[in-house]
């Protein structure tokens, strides 16, 4: 061979393979295939290298390691080339060797597992065989007894039978548990005429059957019996037509019976020995290749009596019967196995049911634990101890309305202002002075998101529930102001906005003050319905409230606290009402109804008389030099005190839309008020003047007493020049210079009307967008002219922190509380001014 190897393992494998091929092709005399075993192509074979075609030579010696490369591989003269295996091939061969080792290990493990199973099966088979042997012995004993009885009764009839003389077993190797190969040879000799003529008729039959290890012993015994019986029957059938049966000369009847018994005993002993040998061979393990087991039988033909023939027939029948119980036993075993499997399945089902029940119990326990934890974590009621004001029993107490009355009322105050009473232990607690000597300071509890108007409503409700009187139930009739610990109003702070949240002032002491803008005419009809004051005492309540309003303004200047004082007119009115009540009790019911109607008619008349004494008449305004007319209508009513030297307060709206309140005397003129207001705010007196809310200009020589508490508006003659310095070239092409000098007059009703403006919004980095901005009393809307949605379509007025004009004409900016600011450009400068004023 021309190939040399370096690895010893590869050489061993090649030797093993060459031996296999050598054995397979030995008889065919194909030496060329042995030479071409290395899978070399014909082109790679060296034709100069001779090789021997003798079959007796071992060609595995041609493969030698590298160390002996100098020697010739064959008897030829030329030396083959040294072809070494590459490292990659070595790695592949090593990997293949490792894989083969792993496969061998797995096969060994499987074989061990199978051997264990076979041992268990063999043990079971041994137990079954022992039981069968015991049963067979019992049956044999019974059969022997019956045979002895029958032998005496039956007549002698000559027959021929075969007896197994020798049984030789040659176990060369361990047989497989599933296959047994037996070759049975039987020779029979038949007697003719009077003498015993032995004719050697050898019949060789090879019976190959594949059975399990559990039935090896039984099959061998059955084969011996069946072969013997068939040979005997065959010989008798052939001899019957030719020769009649003759009795043997030298054998007597009792000797035949004893000989048959001896042969049966010998057969049984041989069978037992064979079974024991087979069991021993199955237990012993060997790695040598398996070989078959050959069993030979020899037989002689003798004449027997009819009794012995019948006995042999019966024994064969018994053996057949013994085989039948074996099949029935196998069926019983299968049934038992099925029952066991069913029992196992039932046990598994029971276990599963038990597991399910346990899981359900665990789930129930977990649910119970969760319920207990939830019950333990439920909130505990916190009882807050609050101070309760003492009720004045001299005054009549009206019970609070029931839930039914609240539901029946279509316009209930609670429905309007919402439920502002917080649950126990939550919300805010405020200290509010009512100005009523009987009530004093109240501790009012409201929710955190309550507004000022809702807080006033809660204060009036608490005052009414505690039995207090003297306050109007309508929360719009009052304002809240900041005060000190003694209840004195702090003049540095204006009245709080009704729409603001109360949380901003939760740490302050507040005072309930009358609202000068509250219209008593419109609310007079609701005073008798809302409760808190009886209908007959409506005049008292109105008069007392009017006195409180006037006295509160006086006490604000003197800082003497918020304590109402009754004037002489009010005392007279109270005396008149008391007299009317006494008369109403004595008069019949008809007179009472008439008096009530008269009182209702007098109620608005008295209010008008009080207001008309301090109110500015239209003729007086028209007679002034300020340029008025007879169409003046005062928008708000203000009550003033009747004292001769009592100071008064007037509300003034400044040009920057801010509101201030200024104290004045009755004898002060309007021009003096203008001078003091402008000096305080560093404004030019010549560029400003006062107007009323309806836009009428007031004369400077008009005394303040004749205003009647009307609100004033401070208007600038040149508002744009003061806010921005504009040159004539800065005016827009569409507008004119007259827009800069045009005066703008606004009042609340006009400012609250919804109006839209077309503007251009300038973004942060330069791009512009067309927008339509709408303004009303509460909000600012942001719309697109292309009917597309905007990011924020509306925002509230109260969220605006600042509005101002820019240096460029027509530009203005809006800043919000969240820190965002936007720049807009109007079409004209006047529209920008109108937007800011609105």
Swiss-Prot record:
Q: What InterPro entries does the record point to? A: CRIM_dom, RBD_dom, Sin1/Avo1
Q: Which residues form the CRIM domain?
A: 441-515
Q: Where are the transmembrane segments?
A: none
Q: Where is the composition biased (Basic and acidic residues)?
A: 310-321
Question: What are the residue boundaries of the RBD domain, all occurrences included?
Answer: 648-717
Q: Keywords for this entry?
A: Chemotaxis
The protein's GO terms of the molecular function aspect are: adenylate cyclase activator activity; phosphatidylinositol-4,5-bisphosphate binding; protein kinase inhibitor activity; protein kinase regulator activity; small GTPase binding
GO BP annotations, alphabetical order: aggregation involved in sorocarp development; chemotaxis to cAMP; negative regulation of phagocytosis; positive regulation of phosphatidylinositol 3-kinase/protein kinase B signal transduction; positive regulation of TORC2 signaling; receptor guanylyl cyclase signaling pathway; regulation of myosin II filament assembly; response to electrical stimulus
Phenotype upon gene inactivation: Null cells have serious developmental defects, because they are unable to activate the aggregation-stage adenylyl cyclase acaA in response to chemoattractant and are defective in chemotaxis. Cells are unable to properly polarize in a cAMP gradient.
Q: Which Pfam families does this UniProt record tie to the protein?
A: CRIM, RBD
UniProt entry tagged with the keyword Cytoplasm = no
Q: Where is this region: Disordered?
A: 66-97, 157-290, 305-336, 522-581, 594-646
- GO CC annotations? cytoplasm; plasma membrane; TORC2 complex
Compositionally biased tracts (Low complexity): 67-97, 157-241, 248-284, 537-556, 563-581, 594-620
Q: Where is the composition biased (Gly residues)?
A: 621-631
Q: What does this protein do?
A: Component of a Ras-regulated pathway involved in integrating chemotaxis and signal relay pathways that are essential for aggregation.
- Return the similarity comment: Belongs to the SIN1 family.
The subunit structure is: Interacts with activated RasG. Part of a complex, TORC2, consisting of tor, lst8, piaA and ripA. Additional proteins, such as 14-3-3 and heat-shock proteins, may also belong to the TORC2 complex.
Protein name, as recorded: Ras-interacting protein RIP3
Q: Which organism is it from?
A: Dictyostelium discoideum (Social amoeba)
* Encoding gene (name): ripA
């Amino acid at each position: 061979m021309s190939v040399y190897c370096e690895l010893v393992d590869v050489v061993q494998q090649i030797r093993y393979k060459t031996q296999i091929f050598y054995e397979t092709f030995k008889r065919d005399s194909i030496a060329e295939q042995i030479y071409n075993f290395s899978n070399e192509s014909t082109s790679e074979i060296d034709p100069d290298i001779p090789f021997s075609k003798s079959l007796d030579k071992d060609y595995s010696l041609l493969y030698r390691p590298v160390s002996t490369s100098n020697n010739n591989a064959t008897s030829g003269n030329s030396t083959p080339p040294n072809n070494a295996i590459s490292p990659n091939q070595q790695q592949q061969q090593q990997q293949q060797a490792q894989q083969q080792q792993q496969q061998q290990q797995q096969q060994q493990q499987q074989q061990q597992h199978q051997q264990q199973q076979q041992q268990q099966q063999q043990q079971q088979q041994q137990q079954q065989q022992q039981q069968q042997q015991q049963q067979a012995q019992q049956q044999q004993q019974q059969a022997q007894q019956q045979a002895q009885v029958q032998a005496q009764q039956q007549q002698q009839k000559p027959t021929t039978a075969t007896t197994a003389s020798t049984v030789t077993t040659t176990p060369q190797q361990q047989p497989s548990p599933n296959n047994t190969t037996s070759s049975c040879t039987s020779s029979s000799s038949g007697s003719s005429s009077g003498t015993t003529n032995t004719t050697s008729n050898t019949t060789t039959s090879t019976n190959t059957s594949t059975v399990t290890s559990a039935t090896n012993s039984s099959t061998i015994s059955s084969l011996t019996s069946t072969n013997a019986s068939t040979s005997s029957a065959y010989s008798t059938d052939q001899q019957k037509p030719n020769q009649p049966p003759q009795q043997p000369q030298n054998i007597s009847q009792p000797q035949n019976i004893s000989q048959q018994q001896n042969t049966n005993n010998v057969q049984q002993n041989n069978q037992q020995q064979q079974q024991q040998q087979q069991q021993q061979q199955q237990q012993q393990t060997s790695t040598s290749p398996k070989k078959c087991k050959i069993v030979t039988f020899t037989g002689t033909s003798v004449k027997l009596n009819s009794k012995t023939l019948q006995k042999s027939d019966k024994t064969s029948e018994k053996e057949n019967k013994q085989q039948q119980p074996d099949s029935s036993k196998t069926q019983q075993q299968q049934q038992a196995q099925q029952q066991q499997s069913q029992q196992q399945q039932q046990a598994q089902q029971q276990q599963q049911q038990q597991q399910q029940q346990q899981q359900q119990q665990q789930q129930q326990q977990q649910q119970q634990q969760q319920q207990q934890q939830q019950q333990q974590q439920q909130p505990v009621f916190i009882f807050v101890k609050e101070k309760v004001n003492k009720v004045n029993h001299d005054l009549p107490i009206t019970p609070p309305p029931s839930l039914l009355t609240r539901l029946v009322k279509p316009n209930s105050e609670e429905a309007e202002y919402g439920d502002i009473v917080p649950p126990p232990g939550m919300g805010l607690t405020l200290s509010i002075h009512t100005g009523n000597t009987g009530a004093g300071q109240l501790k009012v509890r409201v929710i955190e998101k309550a507004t000022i108007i809702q807080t006033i409503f809660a204060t009036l409700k608490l005052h009414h529930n505690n039995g207090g009187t003297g306050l109007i139930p309508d929360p719009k009739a009052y304002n809240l102001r900041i005060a000190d610990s003694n209840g004195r109003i702090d003049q540095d702070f204006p009245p709080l906005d009704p729409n603001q949240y109360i949380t901003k002032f939760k740490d302050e002491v507040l005072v309930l003050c009358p609202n000068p803008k509250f219209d008593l005419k419109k609310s007079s009809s609701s005073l008798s319905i809302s409760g808190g004051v009886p209908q007959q005492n409506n005049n008292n309540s109105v008069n007392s409230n009017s006195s409180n309003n006037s006295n509160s303004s006086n006490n604000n200047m003197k800082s003497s606290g918020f304590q109402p004082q009754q004037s002489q007119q009010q005392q007279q009115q109270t005396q008149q009402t008391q007299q009317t009540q006494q008369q109403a009790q004595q008069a019949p019911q008809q007179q009472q109804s008439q008096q009530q109607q008269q009182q209702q008619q007098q109620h608005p008349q008295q209010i008008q008389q009080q207001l008309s004494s301090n109110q500015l008449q239209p003729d007086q305004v028209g007679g002034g030099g300020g340029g008025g007319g007879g169409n003046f209508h005062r928008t708000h009513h203000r009550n003033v005190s009747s004292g001769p030297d009592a100071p008064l307060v007037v509300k003034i709206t400044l040009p920057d839309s801010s509101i201030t309140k200024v104290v004045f005397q009755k004898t002060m003129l309007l021009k003096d008020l203008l001078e003091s207001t402008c000096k305080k705010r560093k404004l030019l007196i010549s560029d400003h003047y006062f107007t009323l809310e309806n836009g009428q200009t007031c004369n400077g020589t008009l005394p303040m007493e004749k205003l009647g508490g009307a609100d004033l508006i401070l208007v600038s003659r040149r508002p744009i020049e003061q806010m921005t310095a504009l040159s004539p070239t800065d005016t827009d092409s569409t507008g004119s210079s007259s827009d800069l000098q045009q005066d703008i007059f606004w009042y609340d009703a006009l400012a609250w009307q919804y109006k839209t403006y077309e503007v251009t919004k300038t973004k942060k980095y330069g791009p512009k967008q067309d927008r339509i901005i709408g303004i009303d009393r509460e909000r600012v809307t942001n719309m697109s002219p292309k009917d597309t949605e905007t990011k924020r379509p509306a925002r509230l007025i109260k969220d605006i922190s600042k509005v101002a004009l820019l240096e460029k004409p027509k530009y203005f900016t809006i800043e919000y509380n969240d820190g965002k600011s936007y720049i807009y450009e109007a079409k004209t400068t006047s529209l920008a001014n109108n937007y800011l004023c609105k």
